[in-house]
Structure formats: structure tokens, C-alpha cells
């Protein structure tokens, strides 16, 4: 079963929604801001239900979230040496935003990356799933 809950407003002014998924004694909470995992609750060895995801209780915690807790990172995740990637022989330069001398790129764009955007959500009640999509213009990030 999937239910939705309003969660606030993104800095862009778009409403943010939490999707609550329940199946076989487990519960997952995800939101469309950053296609972010908010929580996964499962029974522990004592059969107590515990949340195994680090994150914040309020939406605004995700606005300034340098650890990117739960968010979808991309198009490039982790560190990229000198902020450069090579695709089909063409070198693309990304902003250098990481390291003591800011010589590398971390997670494409920490300020405007995929984890900072409101994604489109599609709920499928038959398969009990939520799918998130985010379209970018060619070369946007």
C-alpha cells in the first residue's frame, strides 16, 4: 500500500511529497525532493521496528545537507579527478568543488545537483512501487 503526505515546500517553490510504502512488515518513506530515502523501518532481532536510515526529521534539514543523506546523486557520484570526465573522446569540465584546494568535483553539483531538485513521481499501486524521474537539458549539469 502507498500513501502520500505533504512535507513542505522546496526552495524552488514546488510542493514536496512523501511517499509511504508498506509491504510485509517493512515500511519505506521516500520523497520527491532529491528522490530521497527518508526512512526504512524493519523489525530487528527483538522484533522491534527500527529505522535504519540516517536523515532529518524536517524538510529543511535536506536543504543544507553536505553529507547528501538519502539523496539521489548525479549524474556523477563521488569525486572526479580535476573535475574532468571524458565521453566519446570529448573532455567535459565540471566545477571543482572538493578538496583542500578545490581541485576535484564532488557529486556533480552540491548546490543544484539532482539531490536538490523536485523529481516527478509515478505511483504504481499494482506493483506497490514509486518511480522518480528528473529530466535535464543536454549539458545542464
Language model region names:
Residues 1-141:
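Surface-exposed acidic/polar loop and edge beta-strand patches at domain peripheries
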Amino acid at each position: 500500500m502507498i500513501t502520500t503526505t505533504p512535507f513542505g515546500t522546496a526552495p524552488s517553490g514546488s510542493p514536496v511529497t512523501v511517499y509511504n510504502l508498506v509491504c510485509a512488515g517493512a515500511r519505506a518513506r521516500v520523497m520527491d525532493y532529491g528522490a530521497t530515502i527518508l526512512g526504512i523501518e524493519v523489525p530487528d532481532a527483538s522484533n522491534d521496528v527500527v529505522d535504519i536510515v540516517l536523515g532529518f526529521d524536517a524538510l529543511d534539514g535536506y536543504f543544507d545537507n553536505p553529507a547528501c543523506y538519502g539523496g539521489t546523486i548525479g549524474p556523477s557520484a563521488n569525486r572526479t579527478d580535476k573535475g574532468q570526465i571524458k565521453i566519446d573522446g570529448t573532455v567535459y569540465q565540471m566545477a571543482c568543488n572538493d578538496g583542500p584546494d578545490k581541485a576535484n568535483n564532488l557529486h556533480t553539483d552540491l548546490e543544484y545537483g539532482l539531490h536538490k531538485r523536485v523529481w516527478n513521481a509515478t505511483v504504481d499501486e499494482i506493483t506497490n512501487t514509486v518511480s522518480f524521474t528528473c529530466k535535464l537539458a543536454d549539458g545542464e549539469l
